[in-house]
């Protein structure tokens, strides 16, 4: 396989991952983006639900209590985390949500179709792709009442460095991981990854030409730092 073919495959993989996860973000006064994270919508034969981190929910609740006009969106669709909460776990740092029909129609992404849930845990010889929407890739037009907010997915392909029954760790060394695609301006070493929390981690299954959702980012700090992918429940 030549370099061009490999890059095209990576670009297609990145686009697929981007279609399966969305930024969850909230603003105040229709002017300021206050904070946000990443959410994956999962579709099983029994239910449709969204997953992000418990700490993302807690930050939203804190800001909602402090600012009466906080308005939340999942992608481009309206979303109220508090009203749609199914359950949460501080231990696993995960929260699950109902996704209203209006949000599903308008959030601009697809749900991940899970044939079985939960999946088999990640192992050290697995090849995985994971990503999310860091604040450093967020763009808001200048001036009051900006009409749009755009944000870019940051994603990586690599193997885990450590696995346990409860969590998986990755070391995001820019010299060792593969960016999807090989972007012209990758994040610099030390760049904040805040906003990637809740992003999905997929196992690559080339023999079946598919990816399998196997976890969620629970702690994203900086490039060249460790973070963990939580066990799905």
Specify the residue positions occupied by each region the protein language model found:
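Catalytic histidine site
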Residues: 5-87, 95-102, 156, 160, ...
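Glycine-centered structural positions embedded in regular secondary structure
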Residues: 39, 132-134, 151-166, 170, ...
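Extended Gly/Ser/Thr-rich low-complexity repeat segments
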Residues: 64-70, 106-114, 192-193
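Catalytic nucleophile loop of clan PA
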Residues: 184-217
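Long hydrophobic alpha-helical segments typical of transmembrane helices together
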Residues: 207-233
